[in-house]
Amino acid sequence: MNIKNFFEKYNIKINDQQIYKEALTHNSYANERKLKYSYQRLEFLGDAILQMYVSKFLFFHYSKLGEGELTRLRSSTVREESLSRIAKDINLGQLIRLGHGELMTKGYEKQSILADIFEALTAAVYIDQNEDGLLIWLEQTLFKYMKDPTFINVTKDFKSELQELLQSEKRSDLKYIIENEEFFVNENKTLYTVSVNLDGQKFGVGKGYSKQEAEQNAASDCLSKLKKPLTN
């Protein structure tokens, strides 16, 4: 499927194909072909756009929630796991331009790449279609997901959930420790490995392309291992 046919499904008639090619071009592809562009600059813009429009959506659709809860929902919505799931649902992986190495390791299925591409493509739509086209795109992708009745339950804050569990048991010795930082040149990102330690013992491990994401995943792993409330 080409770019034009892909966007026809969303009633978007593209004007500048080049901006979409840029949004779908991974660093590995650009390096192999000595291109002067990849999706990274558009990813930067797309991240800011999603922060803004997700904030507006939450503000107007969840009028009873306070600032803290809105912030939690926004963070959960724009995190890698959520965006990559949407990218998979719309079959975005088939459009990504990857280098040979990334193709061999199925880079089109990697959460980090799928999330980045969704951000970059969102920026491309905004540049090419302005706000009207952007809203058409978001309504059929991200906002559709956010309108699901289970949305609030799905976007969990595992760190807060773990903290509440420990507080209920009057336990406070909780620490998140960065165990490893691995830099990936092709993606220009650092993969963090974080452990959750309770009373000096490791109870969970998580990875992510930000410290916050790694901590959330570590907390989730910890919660899954705590089959029953902690006791003194």
Swiss-Prot record:
Q: Which domain of life is it from?
A: Bacteria
Q: Where is the DRBM domain?
A: 157-228
Q: Does the keyword Cytoplasm apply?
A: yes
| InterPro entries given in the database record | dsRBD_dom, RNase_III, RNase_III_dom, RNase_III_sf
Q: Which cofactors, if any, are listed as required?
A: Mg(2+)
- Residues in RNase III domain copies: 3-130
Binding of Mg(2+) occurs at 43, 116, 119
| GO MF annotation, one | rRNA binding
GO cellular component annotations, sorted alphabetically? cytoplasm
One Pfam family, short name: Ribonucleas_3_3
Q: Any idea of its EC number?
A: 3.1.26.3
Q: Does the keyword Nuclease apply?
A: yes
Active-site residues, Swiss-Prot/TrEMBL: 47, 119
Task: Give me any GO biological process, just one.
Answer: mRNA processing
The places in or outside the cell where this protein is found are: Cytoplasm
| NCBIfam families the UniProt entry points to | RNaseIII
Q: Which PANTHER family match?
A: DICER-RELATED, ENDORIBONUCLEASE DICER
How does it associate, per the subunit comment? Answer: Homodimer.
- Name the family: Belongs to the ribonuclease III family.
This molecule's function is given as: Digests double-stranded RNA. Involved in the processing of primary rRNA transcript to yield the immediate precursors to the large and small rRNAs (23S and 16S). Processes some mRNAs, and tRNAs when they are encoded in the rRNA operon. Processes pre-crRNA and tracrRNA of type II CRISPR loci if present in the organism.
What name is this protein filed under? Ribonuclease 3
Q: What species is this protein from?
A: Mycoplasma capricolum subsp. capricolum (strain California kid / ATCC 27343 / NCTC 10154)
The uppermost taxa in this organism's lineage are:
Bacteria, Bacillati, Mycoplasmatota, Mollicutes, Mycoplasmataceae
